[in-house]
Regions:
Chain A
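A charged, amphipathic alpha-helical module
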Residues: 2-63, 189-320, 346
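Peripheral docking tails and interdomain loops at the edges
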Residues: 385-429
Length: 429, 383
């Protein structure tokens, strides 16, 4: 077997993912009207080109770095490497492959991985057990949850991949940011040693600058989402989350958001709603159904229900000042890392989360919240009732709770989701 | 000597006990905590009684189920349920650390729903310490600062002029003595002809966590004398088991194991070896708090420490040899990801060493006794 093939075989799931993306985009091009679901059309095209380039780079022999979704991907741009997000691989393949990622979940369950652990990790673990992934190293924060802390050692102890653990404090104070900044710096240096590369600070700054700009654009988009009707389609939520994970810190992510901003502005000006008529405005303070993101489109078109945003989209952090000294840059990176989606909510107490939700409900004129409680997310398992009470007391809006597995339709099916939300919506209209 | 109706051991079957009542009658405070990853000696030096939260005897979780979804740990839910029913109204303080996702959230739920419920007028100070998830020098420095801040918070909350080094040294001495006594009792169970069962040992550990350590040490000394003079237990027809995993504060579970043809010769539990295995080393007498913190941080870990699996495996290997066990029983309370994944790795690693292993999941309360008994009996027969 040639070196190219051998190298490429380190990321077989990405090859599968690329095929799924190509097929999806072909369907989009052929079936959807030219202006239909722009986020999906533009997003898949951008992601597809980057994944293709990653496969080429892997074939050339660049190190393959596995990383946890909550480790901001632009920080890995300081290396010449192929970054692979473990959680996103599981979930985007769950949504794009015909059979989902269930085979890999079952493989890991059979190996002894408890049924209640996170499928976003279980899928990638199953692929790794089958030797479809061969990482040169993996990097993860020690947050946001027990599943992360419990599952990642598998890669180290079973598969012998070097695992860099970046300790993230479960406390938001100034000393936490300083501590995490040190952890990030030593974690990246350690990762560099493992793959035999020095940190390229120029590239790091460039990637951070791109994300600073993306952040600014997303702010503008979110300001427009406050309008009634919401000028952005529901599918923007999963696609923009995917865009960040797969093309974050790259010009493709910036151009995706720029194009989305222009479309959003136009729709805002014309008071257009993607689904035709907006009947209900919802906020999903937690996750969407990753096993089937087409639920988003169905809600838009069939129920007139806007999903204004979910947990992967509403976290904004201060821009990182890349013109300052390295310590200041790492402090900025630390603050961003600790304010990252799910990390922030998991490592803080509940009060800020509930307060944010209340203020979001008011600012975005939400009619309801839909709280999806995933089986894996124990750190969120004690908040639904408190949030429900707070939303009713402070804003007078209801919250629907649906228990599910974000990446496995076998627990709560798409049909069940549709039925539950339809009945809920009937009570609101 | 029979320990069947021993007053000290019976403390393990209830939450409140006469020692706590006596303690509070003299206007002294009780502080509840969830996990052994807290500096107990510091509370003791502050003349507070540390009480490990448990849910012994609780059968339902219907009140707590309102606030915690069904994917959460039934042990933690049971403790909240008990608290919502007033079972922890006697607490004068509440200390939580980020041991796991389930118990950490009790900080908020106790604050909002237990200590702020109608007709409960006592002000209960709450404390939180953040513990790193890896064992490193930087992590230790972080945790040390957290413990130093906790010391200041305790002094302020309970109007203590100063928790002095002398007091801390005295507490270290008492706690080291306590752990030494527990290790002595543990040795009596490791023997080929043991002096006590695993269930009795669990009772001793639970009782020990529920009363002032000065009294506990006296009681443990008494128990040791009683055990030594007692006739050894015949376990020749039983299989010697190492019990590993999630918290066990329920005697029903250990009795179920021991009634299935097993003898729990040793354990790797937090109401067991994880609690007493390591002592505070007085490396620096000028900074006893640092020594206390070192013990908590560097001690034999539970799986909430992400980078320490191999040390835990080594501990199991040592204990398998020391206790001459025939098999290892790995167990987790459902929804405990930490023990679930650690047990997953142990299962494969121990099988490679030809050690018979059974890996089971259970609820905190004994809702599925028959299923568990069948699996355990089958395992015992197999080995």
């Amino acid at each position: 077997m040639s070196n190219k093939n051998q190298n490429g075989n380190r990321i077989i799931p990405y090859k599968m993912f690329l095929k799924a993306l190509l097929t999806t985009r072909e369907l989009i091009e052929r079936i959807l009207p030219k202006q239909g679901v722009p986020s999906l059309r533009i997003g898949t095209k951008k992601i597809e080109s980057v994944i293709a380039s990653y496969i080429e780079k892997a074939e050339e022999g660049l190190p393959v770095i596995g990383y946890h979704f909550s480790f901001p991907v632009e920080y890995l741009k300081c290396f010449d490497c192929v970054p692979v997000c473990l959680e996103a691989t599981s979930y985007f393949m769950a949504t794009l492959l015909e059979g989902g990622t269930e085979n890999y979940y079952d493989l890991m369950n059979s190996w002894g991985h408890p049924f209640h652990t996170c499928t976003s990790q279980k899928g990638a673990m199953g692929m790794t057990l089958e030797d479809l992934f061969k990482f040169d190293a993996i990097i993860t924060p020690t947050a946001p949850c027990d599943c992360t802390i419990a599952s990642y050692p598998f890669f180290k102890y079973k598969k012998n991949f070097p695992l860099v653990m970046v300790d993230l404090p479960f406390l938001h104070e100034e000393k936490s940011y300083l501590y995490y900044a040190d952890q990030l710096k030593s974690g990246l240096l350690n990762l560099g040693k493992i793959i035999g590369q020095d940190l390229n600070y120029k590239k790091l700054k460039e990637a951070i600058d791109i994300e600073n700009q993306v952040n600014k654009i997303k702010f503008e988009i979110f300001d427009l989402i406050k309008a009634v009707p919401s000028p952005i389609e529901n599918l923007y939520n999963p696609v923009s989350a995917g865009a960040y994970i797969f093309i974050g810190g790259m010009p493709e992510n910036l151009s995706f958001h720029k194009e989305m901003l222009e479309i959003t502005k136009l729709r805002y000006k014309n008071k257009e709603h993607h689904g035709g008529e907006e009947k209900v405005r919802s906020i999903w303070p937690y996750m969407i159904t990753w096993f089937s993101i087409d639920l988003m489109e169905w809600l838009d078109r069939n129920l007139g229900l806007s999903v204004l945003f979910d947990i992967f989209n509403y976290n904004f952090s201060e821009p990182i000042n890349t013109n300052s000294d390295l310590d200041t840059i790492f402090l900025g990176m630390s603050k961003k890392g600790m304010d990252f989606s799910m990390i922030k909510q998991s490592t803080e107490f509940f009060e800020p989360f509930i307060e944010y939700c209340i203020s979001f409900a008011k600012e975005f004129s939400a009619d309801c919240f839909i709280y999806t409680q995933s089986i894996a997310c124990k750190q969120f398992g004690s908040v639904p009732q408190l949030l429900k009470e707070a939303l009713m007391d402070e804003v007078g809006i209801p919250m629907l709770l649906i228990e599910f597995d974000a990446g496995d339709a076998r627990m709560t099916s798409l049909k069940t989701f549709k039925e539950k939300i339809s009945i809920f919506v009937q009570t609101l209209i | 000597m029979s320990l069947k109706n021993d007053f000290f051991l019976n403390i393990s079957t209830s939450i409140i006990n006469p020692y706590i009542e006596d303690w509070q009658k003299s206007n002294r405070k009780v502080v509840g905590y969830y996990c052994t990853y807290i500096p107990e000696e510091l509370l003791h030096a502050a003349e507070l009684l540390p009480f490990r939260i448990r849910a012994t005897g609780t059968k339902d979780t219907d009140l707590a189920d309102i606030y915690m979804v069904r994917f959460t740990c039934s042990f933690v839910r049971a403790t909240l349920d008990l608290a919502l029913r007033g079972g922890y109204d006697f607490l004068d303080g509440f200390l939580v650390c980020n041991s796991c996702d389930h118990s950490r959230r009790m900080f908020e739920l106790f604050n909002l729903k237990v200590f702020n419920r109608e007709n409960f007028n006592k002000k209960v100070p709450q404390f939180y310490i953040a513990l790193p998830h890896v064992i490193t020098d930087e992590g230790f420095e972080w945790y040390k600062k957290e413990v130093e801040e906790l010391k200041e918070e305790l002094e302020k909350a309970y109007q203590i002029k100063e928790i002095t080094n002398e007091k801390l040294l005295k507490s270290i001495h008492i706690y080291n003595e306590n752990r030494k006594l527990l290790r002595s009792i543990h040795e009596l169970r490791l023997q080929e002809k043991p002096k006590l069962t695993g269930s009795e040992f669990l009772k001793i550990n639970i009782a020990n966590s529920s009363i002032p350590k000065e009294i506990a040490n006296q009681e443990l000394n008494r128990i040791i004398i009683a055990l030594k003079s007692r006739k050894s237990i015949d376990v020749s027809n039983k299989k010697r088991i190492l019990l590993v995993g999630s918290i066990v504060d329920n005697l029903d579970f250990t009795q179920l194991i021991e009634n299935s043809g097993a003898f729990i010769a040793s354990d790797f539990l937090c109401f067991g070896t994880r609690y007493f295995y390591d002592d505070v080393q007085l490396v620096n007498r000028d900074d006893p708090l640092e020594n206390i913190t070192k013990r908590v941080y560097y001690r034999i870990s539970c799986p909430r420490m992400m980078d320490d699996h191999l040390r835990r495996l080594d501990f199991l290997k040592e204990e398998i040899n020391r206790a001459k066990v025939d098999g290892v029983l790995l167990q987790r309370i459902n929804n405990c990801d930490l023990h679930g994944c650690d047990n997953m790795l142990f299962t494969h690693e121990l099988k490679e060493l030809d050690v018979p292993v059974l890996n089971i999941d259970r609820e905190f309360y004994q809702s599925d006794t028959t299923r568990l008994q069948t699996r355990i009996e089958a395992f015992i027969e197999m080995i």
